[in-house]
Amino acid sequence: MNDEFKIDSHRFAQVRNARNTEIAEDYTEMIADLIRETGEARAVDLSKHFGVTGPTVNSIIRRLVREGLVESRPYRSIFLTKEGKLLADYCKKRHQIVYNFLIKIGVKKDVAKNDAEGLEHNVSS
């Protein structure tokens, strides 16, 4: 029973870490997109895009600041650090590769767009 608990807790930790990585990737990619499209990335825009509350966005941004991926000050735009830009660029390229692959195998564009968003996080580098 004790070994079974250790295995389950290990699996849970793996899933939690994978989800945290996915969130960091999605947020850095979206911050880069917002900066490119509108000139700035704001917490309210992230909240609208991801369909989450302001406090949820603020919590994630604080974590990304601790991880060295973004810079943020209260009531100001959010900026990517050098590391954040590298991650966002990497994720954007990986997303495009998955999307292009889905199109080549005959998946409709609207379906490929949605599916690529989920699949990109499950592709090993």
Where are these regions (language model features)?
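A ubiquitous short alpha-helical element
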Residues: 14-16, 82-87, 100-101
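Amphipathic alpha-helical dimerization/coiled-coil segments
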Residues: 96-125
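Canonical helix-turn-helix DNA-binding module
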Residues: 43-78, 82
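Basic, amphipathic "hinge/linker" alpha-helix immediately C-terminal to the N-terminal HTH DNA-binding motif
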Residues: 76-95
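Residue-level signal for threonine
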Residues: 21, 80-81, 124
